[in-house]
Amino acid sequence: MNKIFSSHVMPFRALIDACWKEKYTAARFTRDLIAGITVGIIAIPLAMALAIGSGVAPQYGLYTAAVAGIVIALTGGSRFSVSGPTAAFVVILYPVSQQFGLAGLLVATLLSGIFLILMGLARFGRLIEYIPVSVTLGFTSGIGITIGTMQIKDFLGLQMAHVPEHYLQKVGALFMALPTINVGDAAIGIVTLGILVFWPRLGIRLPGHLPALLAGCAVMGIVNLLGGHVATIGSQFHYVLADGSQGNGIPQLLPQLVLPWDLPNSEFTLTWDSIRTLLPAAFSMAMLGAIESLLCAVVLDGMTGTKHKANSELVGQGLGNIIAPFFGGITATAAIARSAANVRAGATSPISAVIHSILVILALLVLAPLLSWLPLSAMAALLLMVAWNMSEAHKVVDLLRHAPKDDIIVMLLCMSLTVLFDMVIAISVGIVLASLLFMRRIARMTRLAPVVVDVPDDVLVLRVIGPLFFAAAEGLFTDLESRLEGKRIVILKWDAVPVLDAGGLDAFQRFVKRLPEGCELRVCNVEFQPLRTMARAGIQPIPGRLAFFPNRRAAMADL
């Protein structure tokens, strides 16, 4: 077990570091309590809104924030992260919930948890850092656009029997449904969104989510007095408990232990075929969860001066996503906005995230009847604000203005693919394209430079600068071959060649074979890695054709 869970992968790392290695005092608990309550106030409406956006009833978002929030806080590797349902998952979870129902979504969440633990055990935590900013910005902006589009129906109260799955068809259907706008829903949505936008400018430390929802409810009261009809959580969502009792809105009880694949009234059947069908979505959830949770941890490190444990965080995220489905929780990861609010509110340890989850549980037990009165247009306004923040429009504009053309192409491609297809295709294509463009950029840096030295006319002395890898070597040796006419000796100085890969080695060997008769290649100042690569390949000096020297002086000794 110790070999599997090393110090870099072991769960509970953040909790141990924050509360065991550092003295946990009453003063620190007070700060965590205040931070936990602050974040809990933000999390309650967001968790419900994100569950609705994911195609399931709002209580499942609360179950996620409660159960996954506690498990990940205690077992993860980032002491300030607050986990729960996040906006990034909406575009993945909604199609799964529509096709397979809640049970299929819970099974996919469980599978994603297994993937996350495997990523942590394989120490993939630091590999996430190699995903280019242009890729992450492209797909997060694309997700923001998609989420924003998905909220227009509820925000305006449009009457739509069916919402198409493809983005362009969805936009067309929304446009055609505009004549069915519900003025009451639209008024509530606009007021709620307006308060969310302008609240931060007031300088009040209380998060704007609660005042915005209260204002939306006040407008709903006016609409009802005027005889209008407004869609609420209670009017749109119904539940059936295990004992057969039914109700509207949100059940006033704790999350119940269930088998994710065996829910009451579910048509989902757990088979190898169903698991195989869910695996791509589960892997997408795991990839997105890993990226978002580790990006969140990096942001928090910058805010607090601490250092997260990337692989421990992946293991903690995996445990949370494995345990949560047994209590009705959907996919969870660290939420950047809630985690940043946690830090700003004075959090000192993962205990603040636990307190935030406890507050969510108390809301389930005490406030469920009141939460059922929340208007759906106000929930949509919350998600529109989340979508705007997630799009990071200011960063997109900055990249368009100042970044190299290659990065702009990658970002726009990732954004478009995320909107038109899905995140997995966007990230896969984006990483491949970014890698190819990066290799082209590096290949252009590999070149031949003249060495100023007094030698006979039939001797050529050049310095190779840059890595000799597959994308650069062929062009470099082709250039060198064009300079060989009338040369008896060619001296190549390799002191600026840090890397020689298999492609570079192959190009080098073919160049040696193509050397004109009577021309000798002398290689000197070879660095360790290229020297080791040639030694492993069995490259040997060839009298009169190929020779190796420790330095340029030795290579020129007999000229």
Curated annotation (Swiss-Prot):
Q: Please state where this protein is localized.
A: Cell inner membrane
This one is known as C4-dicarboxylic acid transporter DauA
Observed phenotype of the null mutant: Mutant is metabolically inactive when succinate is used as sole carbon source. Does not affect growth on glucose, fructose, maltose and glycerol. Deletion mutant shows altered cellular bicarbonate incorporation in the presence of NaCl and impaired growth at alkaline pH.
In its UniProt entry, the species of origin is given as Escherichia coli (strain K12)
What's in the keyword line of the UniProt record?
Answer: Cell inner membrane, Cell membrane, Membrane, Transmembrane, Transmembrane helix, Transport
Q: Does Glycosyltransferase show up as a keyword for this record?
A: no
Q: Which reaction does it catalyse?
A: succinate(in) + 2 H(+)(in) = succinate(out) + 2 H(+)(out); L-aspartate(in) + 2 H(+)(in) = L-aspartate(out) + 2 H(+)(out); fumarate(in) + 2 H(+)(in) = fumarate(out) + 2 H(+)(out)
* Gene Ontology, cellular component aspect: plasma membrane
Membrane topology, as annotated? Multi-pass membrane protein
Give the GO molecular function terms.
Answer: fumarate transmembrane transporter activity; L-aspartate transmembrane transporter activity; secondary active sulfate transmembrane transporter activity; succinate transmembrane transporter activity
What is known about its subunit structure?
A: Interacts via the C-terminal cytoplasmic STAS domain with acyl-carrier protein (ACP), an essential component of the fatty acid biosynthesis (FAB) pathway. It also copurifies with proteins involved in fatty acid metabolism.
**SUPFAM superfamilies linked:** SpoIIaa-like
Cite the ranges annotated as topological domain Cytoplasmic.
Answer: 54, 123-126, 199-212, 300-313, 372, 440-559
Q: State which residue ranges cross the membrane.
A: 33-53, 55-75, 102-122, 127-147, 178-198, 213-233, 279-299, 314-334, 351-371, 373-393, 419-439
Main localization (coarse): membrane
Biological process (GO) annotations held by this record are: aspartate transmembrane transport; fumarate transport; succinate transmembrane transport
Domain STAS per the UniProt entry, residue ranges: 449-559
**Sequence similarity:** Belongs to the SLC26A/SulP transporter (TC 2.A.53) family.
Outline which residue ranges sit on the Periplasmic face: 1-32, 76-101, 148-177, 234-278, 335-350, 394-418
Biological function: Responsible for the aerobic transport of succinate from the periplasm to the cytoplasm at acidic pH. Can transport other C4-dicarboxylic acids such as aspartate and fumarate. May also play a role in the regulation of C4-dicarboxylic acid metabolism at pH 7, via regulation of expression and/or activity of DctA. May act as a co-sensor of DcuS.
InterPro entries, A to Z: S04_transporter_CS, SLC26A/SulP_dom, SLC26A/SulP_fam, STAS_dom, STAS_dom_sf
Q: Which residues form a coiled coil?
A: none
- What superkingdom heads the lineage? Bacteria
**Gene symbol?**
dauA
